[in-house]
A protein has these predicted regions:
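Structural motif
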Residues: 10, 141, 167-168, 192
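N-terminal glycine-/serine-/threonine-rich beta1-alpha1-beta2 phosphate-ribose binding loop
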Residues: 1-153, 241-245, 282, 291
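Phosphate-binding loop/pocket of nucleotide- and phosphate-handling active sites
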Residues: 326-356
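Rossmann-fold NAD(P)-binding glycine/threonine-rich loop
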Residues: 144-159, 167-188
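Catalytic cores and adjacent flexible loops of soluble metabolic enzymes
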Residues: 9, 52, 137, 182, ...
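Hydrophobic beta-strand scaffold residues
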Residues: 164, 188-189, 218
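Short acidic, glycine/serine/threonine-rich loops at helix termini
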Residues: 20-22, 65-68, 152, 176-178, ...
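Active-site-lining helix/loop region of Rossmann-like oxidoreductase modules
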Residues: 10, 48, 62, 73-77, ...
Length: 356
């Protein structure tokens, strides 16, 4: 048997709750393991070989609680596994510095703890916890727009020789300066900005690539996303969306031989609809021309559980980061980032990235 992969997560929201509850779902339903998992094994690591040993958050109602309790705390809304049947764990949730991680629309829901600790004090506490728990990989599920908070955690990884999986659109693995830092320290980093398993952007970029490869010319396209969880509420703050829009747009543009002009493509989150909860709706349109310059168009409506979409990809990102550690690889893990993330340092087609 392989040793457990020791993981800490930053941002104990719906995405993490979906990851934990999903693993427990497969524990309780082993016959379902063929459904929803890209790779049952990656170099002998299964989805059951991940041990979440610590978590970090800013919410006063989560800090100090055990992992199995915190994933059900407000404003989390994933409820695939009843709380009373979720196995207990000794792993705790510890305080993380808020920095820019709490937007104006969500601060009344998240209610950040006011401990009065200075960032230097928290940083020391965090590094001590990481050492005590033997963390090998940190996964960042910070909210969109958490630029300074993401950099804080990236630096913590560099200081403690811990691999970093960056699920959010704050550019670390795809930033040349940060990529060089991880390369120089020989620490793996997988990022940035997780693709959904069958999400809005992966569907959009796949169809864009199909149209491109079939010899048609795309003239304009849009993708509009709406949802009802804290992620979409946070994204009502337009100033937090700069990196997100870049990430999603470049993910689609990278699949075209000739990128579209900026005024011919729109890809981005659009609004918060409370009653949708964790359901995300995507509306996509492509307009183009084919043989004999004849016009065509297509429209797609996609309805998905936003957090199942994330967890099905992160489960591979963690295992691939561990394999990189086992093999002594450092810096951006190119193929893993290209296949699993929207904004890798090097874009590839999805089939090429999967086989790289």
């Amino acid at each position: 048997m392989v040793e457990k992969i020791k993981v800490a997560l930053v941002g104990r929201g719906n995405c993490f709750s979906g990851l934990i509850q999903g693993i427990e779902y497969y524990n309780q339903n082993p016959s379902q393991e063929v459904i929803g998992i890209i790779h049952a094994k990656l170099c002998d690591y299964t989805i059951h070989d991940i041990d979440f040993v610590a978590g970090f958050d800013v919410g006063e109602n989560k800090i100090g609680k055990s992992l199995n309790e915190a994933i059900y705390e407000y404003p989390n809304m994933v409820d695939w596994i009843p709380k009373e049947t979720m196995p207990k764990t000794d792993a705790k949730i510890y305080e993380s510095p808020a920095l820019d991680g709490v937007g104006i629309w969500v601060e009344n829901r998240v209610k950040p703890i006011k401990s009065g600790k200075k960032i230097e004090e928290l940083e020391k506490e965090i590094k001590d916890i990481l050492k005590q728990t033997g963390v090998e990989i940190i996964v960042s599920y910070l909210p969109v727009g958490s630029e300074q908070a993401t950099k804080f955690w990236a630096q913590v990884c560099l200081d403690t020789n811990i691999a970093f999986v960056n699920c959010m659109p704050a550019f670390i693995a795809s930033n040349k300066e940060w990529a060089q830092k991880f390369t120089e320290k020989n620490i793996p980093v997988v990022g940035d900005d997780i693709k959904g398993q069958v999400g809005a952007t992966i569907v959009h970029r796949t169809l864009a690539r199909l149209c491109n490869d079939r010899g048609t010319k795309i003239e304009k396209t849009y993708q509009i996303n709406v949802g009802g969880n804290t992620d979409f509420l946070n994204m009502k703050e337009q100033a937090r969306l700069v990196s997100k829009r870049i990430s999603k747009t470049e993910s689609v543009q990278s699949q075209l031989d000739v990128p579209l002009d900026d005024d011919k493509i729109y890809v981005g989150p659009s609004d918060f609809i409370p009653f949708l909860a964790n359901t995300k709706l995507m509306f996509m349109r492509i307009e183009g021309r084919q043989w004999a310059n004849i016009p065509y168009n297509m429209e797609v409506r996609l309805e998905v559980d936003d957090k199942a979409n994330s967890a099905g990809i992160v489960i591979d990102a963690v295992r691939l980061a561990k394999i990189a550690l086992d093999r002594g690889l450092g810096g951006p893990i190119i193929s893993a980032s290209a296949y699993l993330m929207k904004h890798p340092i090097e874009q590839m087609s999805d089939p090429d990235a999967k086989t790289a």
